[in-house]
Design a protein with these regions (language model features):
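AMP-binding/adenylate-forming catalytic core of the ANL superfamily
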Residues: 115, 120-121, 141-197
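Beta-strand->loop->alpha-helix junctions that form or flank phosphate-binding loops
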Residues: 44-51, 83-85, 187-190
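Gly/Ser/Thr-rich phosphate-binding loop
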Residues: 2-76, 90, 97-102
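Conserved ANL (AMP-binding/adenylate-forming) active-site segment centered on the GW(Y/F)…HTG consensus within
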Residues: 40, 73-79, 104, 116-144, ...
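Short loop/turn microsegments at loop-to-beta-strand junctions
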Residues: 88-90, 133, 138-139, 183
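Conserved beta-loop-beta connector loops within the AMP-binding
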Residues: 84, 88-112, 146-147, 195
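Active-site glycine-centered loops adjacent to acidic/histidine catalytic or metal-binding residues
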Residues: 24, 48, 83, 140, ...
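Residues embedded in well-ordered beta-strands within globular domains across many folds
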Residues: 18-21, 112, 186
């Protein structure tokens, strides 16, 4: 959409557009800034999946009364996160032994979600590894900060292990897309004899 708008800036009347919702994958902050600075449009992002029917979290520049006095930079820091939990749902981040990790913005683990409309099983395909004690195991690696914002680190299958370190492909892609002249980026691991990937 951005490319279309840049190529034909006067073709579309966007004077009534104030918000744009994005889903499917997290937009880079540079794209959210562009919409706000060039068009005055707030890009709202959320996190969810088919199994959450569909929305689990939502992120806005000002999502709480306490955010009214945040600087613009702090507001963009907030919308870069996956957002705050929708009412009626519960989120938890757990380690490999199913123990909850602190909601400190640093501790990373497997994202679990539950609630009255969250998928409890797959029709004719039980997949017990996708469920644990009433929680849906999302397959996302995430953390929750002190204000209860969800921050998706990566899909567990997309993490890159290099030299004993786990590297988020999403973080790398976001840094690359923030560079001038870069529109899209994809980071894919390759096998390496010394570094693993």
């Amino acid at each position: 959409i951005r490319n279309l708008l840049e190529e034909n800036p006067k073709k579309y009347d966007l004077s009534k557009l104030s918000r744009l919702t994005c889903g499917g994958s997290a937009p880079p902050v540079s794209l959210m800034r562009w919409y706000f600075e060039k068009l005055g449009v707030e890009m709202i992002q959320g996190w969810g999946m088919t199994e959450t029917n569909p929305l689990g979290t939502l992120s806005r520049k000002v999502a709480k009364r306490s955010h009214l006095n945040l600087t613009e930079e702090q507001q963009f820091d907030n919308i870069a996160k996956a957002g705050l939990l929708m009412p009626g749902l519960e989120l938890e981040i757990v380690d490999e032994n199913w123990h909850p990790v602190p909601h400190d913005g640093d501790s990373v683990g497997e994202l679990l979600i539950r609630g009255p409309w969250i998928c409890a099983e797959y029709y004719n395909d039980p997949q017990p590894e996708k469920f644990h004690d009433g929680w849906l195991v999302t397959g996302d690696v995430a953390k929750i900060d002190g204000e209860e914002y969800l921050i998706i680190a990566d899909r567990s299958k997309d993490l890159i292990k290099s030299g004993g370190e786990w590297i988020s492909s999403v973080d790398l892609e976001n840094h690359i897309v923030a560079l001038n002249g870069v529109v899209q980026a994809a980071v894919v691991a390759q096998k390496h004899p010394k570094w693993d990937e």
